[in-house]
Amino acid sequence: MNPSFFLTVLCLGVASAAPKLDPNLDAHWHQWKATHRRLYGMNEEEWRRAVWEKNKKIIDLHNQEYSEGKHGFRMAMNAFGDMTNEEFRQVMNGFQNQKHKKGKLFHEPLLVDVPKSVDWTKKGYVTPVKNQGQCGSCWAFSATGALEGQMFRKTGKLVSLSEQNLVDCSRAQGNQGCNGGLMDNAFQYIKDNGCLDSEESYPYLATDTNSCNYKPECSAANDTGFVDIPQREKALMKAVATVGPISVAIDAGHTSFQFYKSGIYYDPDCSSKDLDHGVLVVGYGFEGTDSNNNKFWIVKNSWGPEWGWNGYVKMAKDQNNHCGIATAASYPTV
Protein backbone atom coordinates (compact mmCIF):
# COMPACT_ATOMS: atom_id res chain seq x y z
CA MET A 1 0.00 0.00 0.00
CA ASN A 2 1.36 3.39 -0.99
CA PRO A 3 2.37 5.35 2.15
CA SER A 4 1.56 8.63 0.40
CA PHE A 5 -2.05 7.45 0.04
CA PHE A 6 -2.27 6.83 3.77
CA LEU A 7 -0.83 10.26 4.50
CA THR A 8 -3.23 11.97 2.13
CA VAL A 9 -6.24 10.29 3.71
CA LEU A 10 -4.95 11.03 7.18
CA CYS A 11 -4.38 14.69 6.45
CA LEU A 12 -8.01 15.03 5.37
CA GLY A 13 -9.17 13.82 8.76
CA VAL A 14 -6.81 15.76 11.02
CA ALA A 15 -6.52 19.50 11.36
CA SER A 16 -3.96 21.03 9.04
CA ALA A 17 -2.01 22.48 11.94
CA ALA A 18 0.69 20.30 13.51
CA PRO A 19 -1.01 17.98 16.02
CA LYS A 20 -0.42 18.41 19.74
CA LEU A 21 1.21 15.26 21.03
CA ASP A 22 1.30 14.02 24.62
CA PRO A 23 4.96 13.75 25.76
CA ASN A 24 3.86 11.36 28.53
CA LEU A 25 3.21 8.78 25.82
CA ASP A 26 6.67 8.98 24.23
CA ALA A 27 7.90 5.69 25.73
CA HIS A 28 4.67 3.87 24.81
CA TRP A 29 4.88 5.19 21.24
CA HIS A 30 8.49 4.14 20.76
CA GLN A 31 7.75 0.69 22.21
CA TRP A 32 4.76 0.28 19.90
CA LYS A 33 6.85 1.29 16.87
CA ALA A 34 9.58 -1.19 17.83
CA THR A 35 7.10 -4.01 18.42
CA HIS A 36 5.42 -3.50 15.05
CA ARG A 37 8.56 -2.48 13.14
CA ARG A 38 7.28 0.89 12.00
CA LEU A 39 9.56 3.35 10.23
CA TYR A 40 8.19 6.68 9.04
CA GLY A 41 9.45 9.62 7.06
CA MET A 42 9.94 12.87 8.95
CA ASN A 43 6.73 14.38 7.57
CA GLU A 44 4.58 11.36 8.38
CA GLU A 45 5.57 10.34 11.89
CA GLU A 46 3.78 13.05 13.84
CA TRP A 47 0.57 12.43 11.92
CA ARG A 48 0.81 8.69 12.59
CA ARG A 49 1.53 9.46 16.24
CA ALA A 50 -1.58 11.66 16.38
CA VAL A 51 -3.75 8.85 15.00
CA TRP A 52 -2.17 6.37 17.42
CA GLU A 53 -2.84 8.69 20.38
CA LYS A 54 -6.45 9.17 19.30
CA ASN A 55 -6.93 5.40 19.06
CA LYS A 56 -5.28 4.87 22.43
CA LYS A 57 -7.67 7.33 24.07
CA ILE A 58 -10.65 5.49 22.54
CA ILE A 59 -9.29 2.17 23.83
CA ASP A 60 -8.54 3.51 27.32
CA LEU A 61 -12.00 5.09 27.64
CA HIS A 62 -13.73 1.91 26.48
CA ASN A 63 -11.76 -0.22 28.95
CA GLN A 64 -12.59 2.17 31.79
CA GLU A 65 -16.26 1.76 30.90
CA TYR A 66 -15.74 -2.01 30.66
CA SER A 67 -14.43 -2.01 34.25
CA GLU A 68 -17.64 -0.18 35.23
CA GLY A 69 -19.76 -2.91 33.63
CA LYS A 70 -20.87 -0.87 30.62
CA HIS A 71 -19.40 -3.23 27.99
CA GLY A 72 -18.97 -6.99 27.68
CA PHE A 73 -15.60 -6.93 25.91
CA ARG A 74 -12.18 -5.34 26.22
CA MET A 75 -10.15 -3.49 23.61
CA ALA A 76 -6.35 -3.29 23.26
CA MET A 77 -3.75 -1.50 21.17
CA ASN A 78 -2.50 -3.66 18.31
CA ALA A 79 -0.82 -3.54 14.89
CA PHE A 80 -3.61 -1.31 13.54
CA GLY A 81 -2.83 1.44 16.04
CA ASP A 82 -1.54 4.01 13.52
CA MET A 83 -4.41 3.53 11.07
CA THR A 84 -7.55 5.64 10.92
CA ASN A 85 -10.74 3.64 10.88
CA GLU A 86 -11.26 4.64 7.24
CA GLU A 87 -7.85 3.25 6.28
CA PHE A 88 -8.47 0.12 8.30
CA ARG A 89 -11.74 -0.60 6.50
CA GLN A 90 -10.21 0.00 3.07
CA VAL A 91 -7.17 -2.21 3.64
CA MET A 92 -8.40 -5.08 5.82
CA ASN A 93 -12.03 -5.70 4.86
CA GLY A 94 -12.47 -7.24 1.41
CA PHE A 95 -15.82 -9.01 1.42
CA GLN A 96 -18.07 -7.94 -1.45
CA ASN A 97 -21.72 -8.38 -0.56
CA GLN A 98 -24.07 -10.11 -3.00
CA LYS A 99 -27.85 -9.97 -3.19
CA HIS A 100 -28.52 -13.24 -5.00
CA LYS A 101 -27.49 -16.61 -3.57
CA LYS A 102 -26.10 -19.14 -6.03
CA GLY A 103 -25.67 -22.31 -4.00
CA LYS A 104 -27.96 -25.08 -2.84
CA LEU A 105 -30.08 -24.17 0.17
CA PHE A 106 -29.24 -25.72 3.53
CA HIS A 107 -32.05 -27.93 4.82
CA GLU A 108 -32.10 -27.81 8.59
CA PRO A 109 -32.11 -31.27 10.20
CA LEU A 110 -35.44 -31.62 12.00
CA LEU A 111 -34.80 -34.49 14.38
CA VAL A 112 -31.36 -33.45 15.60
CA ASP A 113 -30.85 -32.16 19.13
CA VAL A 114 -28.00 -29.68 18.71
CA PRO A 115 -25.67 -29.25 21.69
CA LYS A 116 -25.57 -26.01 23.65
CA SER A 117 -21.90 -25.56 22.83
CA VAL A 118 -19.60 -26.68 20.00
CA ASP A 119 -15.91 -26.00 19.38
CA TRP A 120 -14.40 -27.56 16.25
CA THR A 121 -10.91 -26.29 17.16
CA LYS A 122 -10.87 -29.05 19.80
CA LYS A 123 -11.80 -31.73 17.25
CA GLY A 124 -8.94 -31.17 14.79
CA TYR A 125 -10.97 -29.36 12.12
CA VAL A 126 -9.19 -25.99 12.27
CA THR A 127 -5.70 -24.88 11.19
CA PRO A 128 -3.74 -22.26 13.18
CA VAL A 129 -4.75 -18.61 12.79
CA LYS A 130 -3.30 -17.03 9.64
CA ASN A 131 -2.58 -13.41 8.68
CA GLN A 132 -3.90 -11.83 5.48
CA GLY A 133 -1.57 -8.82 5.81
CA GLN A 134 -2.47 -5.58 4.02
CA CYS A 135 -4.50 -7.36 1.35
CA GLY A 136 -8.30 -7.52 1.17
CA SER A 137 -8.27 -11.31 0.89
CA CYS A 138 -10.37 -12.14 3.96
CA TRP A 139 -12.79 -14.01 1.68
CA ALA A 140 -10.01 -16.43 0.66
CA PHE A 141 -9.10 -17.22 4.28
CA SER A 142 -12.73 -17.79 5.18
CA ALA A 143 -13.14 -20.12 2.19
CA THR A 144 -10.00 -22.17 2.86
CA GLY A 145 -10.97 -22.48 6.52
CA ALA A 146 -14.34 -23.98 5.65
CA LEU A 147 -12.83 -26.34 3.09
CA GLU A 148 -10.01 -27.38 5.45
CA GLY A 149 -12.70 -28.44 7.93
CA GLN A 150 -14.73 -30.38 5.37
CA MET A 151 -11.64 -32.15 4.02
CA PHE A 152 -10.70 -33.14 7.58
CA ARG A 153 -14.23 -34.43 8.10
CA LYS A 154 -13.88 -36.55 4.94
CA THR A 155 -10.27 -37.76 5.20
CA GLY A 156 -9.21 -37.35 8.83
CA LYS A 157 -6.25 -35.24 7.67
CA LEU A 158 -5.92 -31.50 8.34
CA VAL A 159 -4.04 -29.76 5.52
CA SER A 160 -3.54 -25.99 5.32
CA LEU A 161 -4.87 -24.80 1.95
CA SER A 162 -3.62 -22.02 -0.32
CA GLU A 163 -5.26 -18.61 -0.08
CA GLN A 164 -2.83 -17.30 -2.70
CA ASN A 165 -4.16 -19.87 -5.17
CA LEU A 166 -7.60 -18.27 -4.71
CA VAL A 167 -6.28 -14.69 -4.81
CA ASP A 168 -4.41 -15.32 -8.07
CA CYS A 169 -6.75 -17.63 -9.93
CA SER A 170 -10.44 -16.99 -9.18
CA ARG A 171 -11.06 -13.76 -11.11
CA ALA A 172 -13.11 -15.58 -13.73
CA GLN A 173 -15.55 -16.47 -10.95
CA GLY A 174 -15.86 -12.81 -9.92
CA ASN A 175 -13.21 -12.36 -7.23
CA GLN A 176 -10.76 -9.46 -7.33
CA GLY A 177 -7.75 -10.68 -5.41
CA CYS A 178 -6.58 -8.20 -2.78
CA ASN A 179 -9.43 -5.89 -3.76
CA GLY A 180 -12.06 -8.25 -2.41
CA GLY A 181 -14.18 -11.26 -3.23
CA LEU A 182 -16.76 -13.77 -2.07
CA MET A 183 -16.39 -17.13 -0.40
CA ASP A 184 -19.03 -18.65 -2.71
CA ASN A 185 -17.01 -17.49 -5.73
CA ALA A 186 -13.97 -19.20 -4.22
CA PHE A 187 -15.90 -22.45 -3.77
CA GLN A 188 -17.09 -22.16 -7.38
CA TYR A 189 -13.50 -21.73 -8.59
CA ILE A 190 -12.39 -24.85 -6.73
CA LYS A 191 -15.22 -26.83 -8.31
CA ASP A 192 -14.49 -25.44 -11.79
CA ASN A 193 -10.74 -26.00 -11.42
CA GLY A 194 -11.12 -29.47 -9.97
CA CYS A 195 -8.92 -28.82 -6.94
CA LEU A 196 -6.96 -26.36 -4.78
CA ASP A 197 -3.27 -26.37 -3.93
CA SER A 198 -1.89 -26.66 -0.41
CA GLU A 199 -0.46 -23.69 1.46
CA GLU A 200 2.93 -25.40 1.40
CA SER A 201 3.02 -25.72 -2.39
CA TYR A 202 1.48 -22.30 -3.13
CA PRO A 203 2.45 -20.02 -0.21
CA TYR A 204 0.71 -16.78 0.69
CA LEU A 205 2.28 -13.50 -0.50
CA ALA A 206 -0.34 -10.92 0.61
CA THR A 207 -0.33 -9.30 -2.83
CA ASP A 208 -1.80 -9.65 -6.30
CA THR A 209 0.72 -11.44 -8.52
CA ASN A 210 -1.40 -11.03 -11.68
CA SER A 211 -0.59 -14.61 -12.66
CA CYS A 212 -2.10 -17.95 -11.70
CA ASN A 213 0.56 -20.43 -10.60
CA TYR A 214 -1.69 -23.36 -9.75
CA LYS A 215 0.07 -26.73 -9.94
CA PRO A 216 -2.25 -29.73 -10.52
CA GLU A 217 0.30 -32.10 -9.03
CA CYS A 218 0.08 -30.20 -5.71
CA SER A 219 -3.67 -30.50 -5.33
CA ALA A 220 -4.73 -30.89 -1.71
CA ALA A 221 -8.53 -30.43 -1.77
CA ASN A 222 -11.57 -30.11 -3.99
CA ASP A 223 -15.28 -29.45 -3.69
CA THR A 224 -18.43 -30.32 -5.62
CA GLY A 225 -20.21 -27.03 -4.98
CA PHE A 226 -21.47 -25.12 -1.98
CA VAL A 227 -24.50 -24.69 0.25
CA ASP A 228 -25.99 -21.35 1.35
CA ILE A 229 -27.55 -21.23 4.81
CA PRO A 230 -30.85 -19.39 5.46
CA GLN A 231 -30.35 -16.00 7.09
CA ARG A 232 -31.27 -17.13 10.60
CA GLU A 233 -29.03 -17.76 13.58
CA LYS A 234 -30.88 -20.97 14.42
CA ALA A 235 -30.11 -22.31 10.95
CA LEU A 236 -26.47 -21.27 11.32
CA MET A 237 -26.32 -22.97 14.72
CA LYS A 238 -27.61 -26.23 13.24
CA ALA A 239 -25.13 -26.01 10.38
CA VAL A 240 -22.19 -25.38 12.70
CA ALA A 241 -23.27 -28.25 14.97
CA THR A 242 -23.83 -30.81 12.20
CA VAL A 243 -21.49 -29.78 9.36
CA GLY A 244 -18.40 -28.12 10.86
CA PRO A 245 -16.75 -24.69 10.45
CA ILE A 246 -18.87 -22.33 8.34
CA SER A 247 -17.85 -19.35 6.19
CA VAL A 248 -19.66 -16.16 7.19
CA ALA A 249 -19.43 -12.44 6.51
CA ILE A 250 -19.80 -9.70 9.11
CA ASP A 251 -19.75 -5.95 9.58
CA ALA A 252 -16.21 -5.55 10.95
CA GLY A 253 -15.74 -1.90 10.11
CA HIS A 254 -15.94 -0.39 13.59
CA THR A 255 -13.12 0.89 15.78
CA SER A 256 -14.41 -1.42 18.52
CA PHE A 257 -13.70 -4.42 16.27
CA GLN A 258 -10.40 -3.01 14.99
CA PHE A 259 -9.07 -3.10 18.57
CA TYR A 260 -11.10 -5.98 20.03
CA LYS A 261 -9.18 -8.02 22.61
CA SER A 262 -11.43 -10.31 24.65
CA GLY A 263 -14.96 -10.89 25.90
CA ILE A 264 -18.23 -11.11 23.94
CA TYR A 265 -18.21 -8.54 21.15
CA TYR A 266 -21.35 -6.43 20.86
CA ASP A 267 -21.56 -2.98 19.25
CA PRO A 268 -25.02 -1.39 18.85
CA ASP A 269 -23.83 0.29 15.64
CA CYS A 270 -23.00 -3.02 13.97
CA SER A 271 -25.08 -3.69 10.85
CA SER A 272 -26.71 -6.98 9.88
CA LYS A 273 -26.78 -5.97 6.20
CA ASP A 274 -23.66 -3.92 5.39
CA LEU A 275 -21.10 -6.72 5.46
CA ASP A 276 -17.43 -6.13 4.69
CA HIS A 277 -15.33 -8.97 6.15
CA GLY A 278 -15.19 -12.73 5.62
CA VAL A 279 -14.45 -14.91 8.66
CA LEU A 280 -15.03 -18.48 9.88
CA VAL A 281 -17.46 -19.64 12.56
CA VAL A 282 -15.82 -22.62 14.29
CA GLY A 283 -18.26 -23.07 17.14
CA TYR A 284 -20.52 -21.44 19.70
CA GLY A 285 -21.02 -21.41 23.44
CA PHE A 286 -22.00 -19.39 26.49
CA GLU A 287 -20.36 -17.82 29.52
CA GLY A 288 -21.43 -18.59 33.07
CA THR A 289 -23.83 -21.30 34.20
CA ASP A 290 -26.97 -20.22 32.32
CA SER A 291 -26.88 -21.49 28.75
CA ASN A 292 -29.63 -19.02 27.76
CA ASN A 293 -27.54 -15.94 28.52
CA ASN A 294 -24.17 -14.56 27.44
CA LYS A 295 -24.18 -16.68 24.29
CA PHE A 296 -21.49 -16.26 21.64
CA TRP A 297 -20.18 -17.50 18.32
CA ILE A 298 -16.53 -18.59 18.19
CA VAL A 299 -15.11 -16.83 15.14
CA LYS A 300 -11.69 -17.36 13.57
CA ASN A 301 -10.26 -14.18 12.04
CA SER A 302 -7.34 -13.78 9.60
CA TRP A 303 -5.41 -10.92 11.21
CA GLY A 304 -2.80 -13.05 12.98
CA PRO A 305 -2.78 -14.57 16.50
CA GLU A 306 -1.82 -11.25 18.13
CA TRP A 307 -5.19 -9.72 17.29
CA GLY A 308 -8.12 -10.31 19.61
CA TRP A 309 -8.49 -13.50 21.60
CA ASN A 310 -5.46 -15.33 20.14
CA GLY A 311 -6.72 -14.46 16.66
CA TYR A 312 -10.35 -15.25 17.47
CA VAL A 313 -13.37 -13.20 18.52
CA LYS A 314 -16.40 -14.18 20.55
CA MET A 315 -19.36 -12.52 18.83
CA ALA A 316 -22.76 -12.02 20.45
CA LYS A 317 -25.13 -14.87 19.55
CA ASP A 318 -28.93 -14.73 19.29
CA GLN A 319 -28.90 -10.94 19.37
CA ASN A 320 -30.93 -10.25 16.21
CA ASN A 321 -28.24 -11.52 13.84
CA HIS A 322 -25.67 -9.16 15.34
CA CYS A 323 -23.16 -7.83 12.77
CA GLY A 324 -24.89 -9.95 10.12
CA ILE A 325 -23.18 -13.18 11.13
CA ALA A 326 -26.03 -15.27 9.65
CA THR A 327 -26.66 -13.09 6.59
CA ALA A 328 -24.18 -14.68 4.17
CA ALA A 329 -23.22 -18.07 5.66
CA SER A 330 -22.15 -20.97 3.45
CA TYR A 331 -19.92 -24.04 3.25
CA PRO A 332 -18.41 -26.20 0.48
CA THR A 333 -19.58 -29.72 -0.28
CA VAL A 334 -16.90 -32.39 -0.76
From Swiss-Prot:
Keyword Signal part of the UniProt annotation: yes
Pfam families tied to this protein: Inhibitor_I29 (PF08246), Peptidase_C1 (PF00112)
Active site, per annotation: 138, 277, 301
Residues that carry a glycan: 222
Disulfide bonds: 135-178, 169-212, 270-323
The EC number(s) this enzyme carries: 3.4.22.43
The keyword Hydrolase is annotated on this UniProt entry: yes
Propeptide positions: 18-113
GO BP, sorted A to Z: proteolysis involved in protein catabolic process
Function of the protein: Cysteine protease. May have an important role in corneal physiology.
Family indicated by similarity: Belongs to the peptidase C1 family.
Protein name as annotated: Cathepsin L2
